[in-house]
């Protein structure tokens, strides 16, 4: 416990020093995270509209292509990092839980493939890739819900973006390749 307390004290003392090295847009991003209502038409607009859209989805959502915040252009760039906002508005709490369940199954299967793999590289890759997918999902959903600052983290498989989609598909291809390689060793 004394290590945690001493680490916390060092962090508190060092924070003002590190803040002096931040660029103005980085400082604005941090300030917007703590108080988005301070600039509701500027830096805080995206996160405020995101929270409104997620909340307006309610329990069962508004229906496919019937989201008001998203399709009346209150939510800019909804197809990129804020795709979860659009999904939550259209499919509600039930759809969001369903999406989390699908992602959980995907991560479980990736970790499972790593656990049965006999190749050390495949094992490490699957564990690392499963963790990476989990972190991207957690950061994106936390960002959309206002629990973390907006950092531009895509939601795997759903967000619009060529490089993110390509990297995700290559990673899933390596995972599937390790599964096929495992089957060939057994057979």
What are these regions (language model features)?
Residues 3-96, 120-122:
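Hydrophobic, glycine- and aromatic-enriched re-entrant/interface helices and adjoining loop segments
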Residues 112-152, 158:
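Loop-to-helix entry and N-terminal half of a specific, functionally important transmembrane alpha helix
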Residues 26, 103-110, 130, 143, ...:
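Hydrophobic/aromatic residues in alpha-helical transmembrane segments
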Residues 90-108:
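Hydrophobic alpha-helical transmembrane segments
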Residues 9, 86-89, 129-133, 161-164:
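Transmembrane helix-bundle signature of multi-pass membrane transporters/permeases
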Residues 1, 105-115, 175-182:
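Structural signal for the C-terminal ends of transmembrane alpha-helices
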Residues 140-187:
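A juxtamembrane structural motif centered on a specific transmembrane helix
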């Amino acid at each position: 416990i004394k290590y945690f307390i001493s680490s916390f004290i060092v962090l508190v003392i060092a924070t003002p020093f590190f803040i002096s090295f931040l660029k103005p847009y980085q400082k604005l991003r941090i300030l917007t995270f703590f108080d988005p209502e301070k600039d509701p038409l500027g830096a805080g607009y995206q996160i405020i509209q995101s929270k409104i859209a997620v909340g307006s989805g309610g329990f069962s959502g508004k229906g496919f292509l019937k989201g008001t915040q998203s399709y009346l252009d209150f939510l800019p760039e909804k197809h990129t990092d804020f795709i979860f906002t659009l999904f939550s508005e259209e499919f509600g709490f039930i759809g969001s839980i369903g999406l989390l369940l699908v992602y959980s199954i995907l991560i479980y299967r990736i970790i499972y493939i790593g656990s049965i793999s006999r190749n050390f590289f495949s094992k490490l890759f699957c564990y690392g890739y499963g963790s990476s997918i989990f972190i991207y999902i957690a950061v994106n959903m936390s960002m959309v819900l206002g629990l973390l600052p907006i950092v531009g983290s895509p939601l795997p498989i759903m967000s619009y973006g060529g490089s993110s989609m390509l990297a995700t598909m290559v990673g899933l291809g390596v995972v599937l390749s390790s599964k096929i390689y495992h089957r060939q060793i057994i057979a």
